Amino acid sequence: MNDVEIIEVAPRDGFQAVKPLIATERKIALIEELAACGFRRLEIGSFVSPKAIPQLADTGEVLRRVRLPAHLRIQALVANARGLEMAMAAGVRELVWVISVSESHNRANVNRSVDESFKAFETAWAGLGRDRPWLRLGLSTCFDCPWEGRVPEDNVVRLVERTIAAAPEVEIAICDTTGRASPDHVGSLFGRLMRRYASPKVTFAYHGHDTYNLGVTNAIEAYKAGVRVIDGAAGGLGGCPFAPG
C-alpha cells in the first residue's frame, strides 16, 4: 500500500506548546476548520493533569461542543489510569497512551520510571476487558533524550515487544520528541521494527518534529521503511513542554 494517512495533531501537540491560553471557542473553531480539510483522523487533546498542561484542561468541553464530520476519527492522549478514566467518561473511543523510552524524560513527564508507567498501562488495559477502545501506544524519545542523548535502538525494541504482549492489536507511534533524529537513525530503527513486528494487527506510525529542518526528510525515511501513518501539525506547531531545548 502506497497511500499515506496524515494524522492532524495540532489540537493536542500544537496547542500544548502555546503558552497563552487559547479560548475554548477559538479551539473549537480551529478544530472544525482543520476537520474541513479532509483528514481522516485528528488528535483532539489530552486528559492529563491541568497543572501540568493547563492549555488542554478543557479537552472534555471541546469534545462535547465541537461539531465534526461523521467520518473523522477522533483520538485523545492519556498518560495514566486517571487520564484513561476521564477519556472513557468523555466518550473517547480512540486512545493514545504515551510512555517515554528514556527514564529521564518519563520522570520529567509523569514522575514515574518507565517500568512503573508500563505496569500502570498493562494493569489498566487488562482491566478494561471487552470495553477497550482502539489503541495507539505512543513511545516518546525513541531517538533522542534531552538529558540522556541518543536512545539505544534496543531500548525501543524492548518496549515495542512489551507493548505487543500487553495489547496484541495496536498502533505504535515511534516518536522523535526533540526533533533531533537523523534520517539514517529513522531508517535504521523503522527498518528493524517493520521487518520484525509489523503485521495486520500491529502497525507503526511516525511522530516527528522539524526542530532542525529534518521533519520531512525523516518522514520520508519512515515511509521508505514501510510506515504509512505519519503525524503532522498545522503551522508546524508542537513540542513537548517537558523537553528542554
Where are these regions (language model features)?
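N-terminal small/glycine-rich loop or linker at the start of catalytic domains
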Residues: 1-19, 96-109, 132-147, 189-201
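Glycine-rich, proline-tolerant flexible connector loops at the mouths of alpha/beta enzymes
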Residues: 40-65, 99-112, 141-148, 173-183, ...
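Conserved anion-binding
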Residues: 102-161, 165-177
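Active-site mouth loops of central-metabolism enzymes
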Residues: 6-28, 72-81, 106-113, 142-155, ...
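Catalytic alpha/beta core domains of metabolic enzymes, predominantly
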Residues: 175-245
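N-terminal capping/small domains of soluble enzymes
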Residues: 1-82
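Alpha-helix-loop-beta-strand connector modules within alpha/beta enzyme cores
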Residues: 52-76, 115-135, 158-163, 186-206
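Hydrophobic faces of well-ordered beta-strands that scaffold small-molecule active sites
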Residues: 5-13, 40-44, 72-78, 95-97, ...
